[in-house]
């Protein structure tokens, strides 16, 4: 799986 986060 792939997780990406931007804040």
Curated annotation (Swiss-Prot):
Tree of life domain: Eukaryota
Note: On the 2D-gel the determined pI of this unknown protein is: 6.0, its MW is: 30.0 kDa.
Name assigned to this protein: Unknown protein from spot 447 of 2D-PAGE of etiolated coleoptile
Organism: Zea mays (Maize)
């Amino acid at each position: 799986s792939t997780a990406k986060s931007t804040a």
